[in-house]
From Swiss-Prot:
Short name of any one Pfam family annotated for the protein: Homeodomain
Region Disordered, residue ranges: 52-116
Name the UniProt record assigns to this protein: Homeobox-leucine zipper protein HOX18
Protein's gene: HOX18
Tissue expression per record: Expressed in roots, leaf sheaths and blades and panicles.
Species of the source: Oryza sativa subsp. japonica
Disulfide bridges in this chain: none
Major subcellular site: nucleus
Stored PROSITE patterns: HOMEOBOX_1, HOMEOBOX_2
Taxonomic classification: Eukaryota, Viridiplantae, Streptophyta, Embryophyta, Tracheophyta
Record keywords, A-Z: DNA-binding, Homeobox, Nucleus, Transcription, Transcription regulation
Amino acid sequence: MEGEDLGSWLGLGIGGGGYAYGGDDCRRSPSSPSPVQMLFSQHVKEEITRGYDHGRDEEQASGSKIMKGERGARLRVMRSIRNSGGDGSRSRVLSLGDDGGDGGSGGGGGGGTRKKLQLTKEQSTLLEDSFRVHNILSHAQKHELARQLKLKPRQVEVWFQNRRARTKLKQTEVDCEFLKRCCESLTEENKQLKHELMELRRLASPAAAAAGSQLYVQFPRAAAAAMVNVCPSCEKVTVMGGGGGETGKSSSSYSS
């Protein structure tokens, strides 16, 4: 009996009722409460259930709020993209314009717009003088010049960058114009040289023909008759006289 009471009290099935033992087989007793159910009263179980339902409702409400917030953020982004003309990644650029009296463009203003930083005449003069001395500033020089001009160091740095770019562009334009003029001059000189060469060739043609005719000079017959022949058989020098006959023989043996 004590074993049966202990088994029925433990229940062996917390979710359902206990088990009643009768002999060798066991049968489920749905009417008997489980030990877990016996630990808590009905009021406590209702409070636990109500708290669980309340927490689940709060999670659902917070999830709906997050979804609404994300949807609203997406709508705001799309609206801003449409208002900015399709460029949603417009950045705020810090730049300075020309070094003249109108100054340059300063730091980007609100809403992605670019505001111009108006430089006074004294500021422009001081910047130009500093650029003539040093076109690249060190960290200390940049901060000192910004303090004198009452500007930000970044603005001074950007002004010097733009000034160097403009100087390089102007120098490139000057070099291009100079090379263009040199090319035109060389082209004209080449045309003149070609014309002079054609004139020289035209004038040199008759003179070359006359010089070629003078090279072929007719030798007189007396000179031709006085040619010295060597007889290969006897190795003697024979002087031929005029008329084709032998007028005289001057033999000298070359045999050793």
